[in-house]
């Protein structure tokens, strides 16, 4: 079974909730660094600070990550596959030293952040929709890394 219309709608509505509050971007990176402190150096906007500090670069990067997962949901619904809009993503991830466990950390942080943003609208169905969309994106990035 492919990505359903309902799953796409769930991702769309929670994406809108995420975008409404910039503090979710800080939460996202705080969770990443709690789970994988060594990842701090991978992000130019985090490596020189003692803790996660809000900044335009942090906001832009978080919105890009969540936006790409959102776009992946749309692509999965439309065609059943994710095609990267930015062909340099594979090379960037190689350059930063990203390995498989990092994708797991980001997925967990993304799901925790969406859970927080969704509040009472959170459900297993919503979590599954984001997880499938993220896995589609992660798979496309890993493919571009090879």
Swiss-Prot record:
According to its UniProt record, where is this protein located? Answer: Cytoplasm, Cytosol; Nucleus
Q: Which PROSITE patterns match?
A: GLOBIN, PLANT_GLOBIN
Which GO molecular function, any one, fits this protein according to its record? oxygen binding
Main location as per UniProt: cytoplasm
Phosphoserine occurs at which residues? 44
Q: How is it modified after translation?
A: Nitrated in effective nodules and particularly in hypoxic conditions; this mechanism may play a protective role in the symbiosis by buffering toxic peroxynitrite NO(2)(-). Nitration level decrease during nodule senescence. Phosphorylation at Ser-44 disrupts the molecular environment of its porphyrin ring oxygen binding pocket, thus leading to a reduced oxygen consumption and to the delivery of oxygen O(2) to symbiosomes.
Query: Which residue intervals define the domain Globin in the entry?
Result: 2-146
Q: What does this protein do?
A: Leghemoglobin that reversibly binds oxygen O(2) through a pentacoordinated heme iron. In root nodules, facilitates the diffusion of oxygen to the bacteroids while preventing the bacterial nitrogenase from being inactivated by buffering dioxygen, nitric oxide and carbon monoxide, and promoting the formation of reactive oxygen species (ROS, e.g. H(2)O(2)). This role is essential for symbiotic nitrogen fixation (SNF).
PANTHER family per UniProt: LEGHEMOGLOBIN-RELATED, NON-SYMBIOTIC HEMOGLOBIN 2
As for family, the record states: Belongs to the plant globin family.
**Protein name, please?**
Leghemoglobin Lb120-8
Record organism: Pisum sativum
